[in-house]
Every structure is written in C-alpha cells, then in structure tokens.
C-alpha cells in the first residue's frame, strides 16, 4: 500500500542547524523568525519550519522541503537570505551553521 507522501519522494529536503553565540540567543531567534514569512512565498517552497532544541535553548533547526535544487539555490540568493548572511557571523557561535541536503529513500 502506498503512503500518502510517496508522490513527494522527489523533493529536496534540507536541515539547517544554527547555534547562537553566547548572549545572542534572542537576536538569532528573531533573525530566523524573520526569514519564515518571505521564504514561504518563494517559488518551489513546500515547507520551511523553524524549531528550537528544547534541551539546548539557542540551538535552532530549519526543516525544509523544496521542489528542486534550483528552487533551493534561488532561495539561498533571495534578498532576505542575503541580509541574514550579512549579520549571521555576529549571531552564531564558531561552529554554529551546518546545512545538510537529503533525499528521501523510503
């Protein structure tokens, strides 16, 4: 029996991990929250969900799905993302950004 999401196996899934520099947790949270609404209006967006680690406040994850790599690439050059890139160095700790691209296999 097929699952309801089988037709979506071609999506590009991204998990972005971001950890705030000490004392910058609230600033990073606000900056990340400001990315959600404009991203959800982008072409190729499927979902763009921001989470915070309940055991490690100030550690955030975006769980994203995109129609294609081209849509993700366009997202990464969108004005709201380039503005964030300009300030993220002040908000993240030294190991504070990891982006993982995934493809669904089952």
Q: What positions do the PLM features span?
A:
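N-terminal first-folded block
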Residues: 8-41, 46
């Amino acid at each position: 029996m097929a699952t309801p999401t089988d037709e979506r196996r071609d999506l590009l899934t991204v998990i972005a991990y971001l950890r705030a520099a000490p004392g910058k947790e609230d600033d990073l949270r606000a900056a990340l929250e400001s990315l959600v609404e404009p991203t959800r209006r982008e072409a190729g967006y499927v979902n763009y969900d921001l989470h915070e680690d309940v055991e490690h406040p100030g550690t955030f994850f975006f769980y994203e799905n995109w129609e294609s790599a081209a849509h993700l690439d366009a997202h990464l050059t969108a004005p709201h993302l380039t503005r964030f890139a300009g300030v993220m160095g002040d908000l993240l700790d030294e190991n504070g950004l990891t982006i993982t691209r995934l493809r669904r296999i089952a």
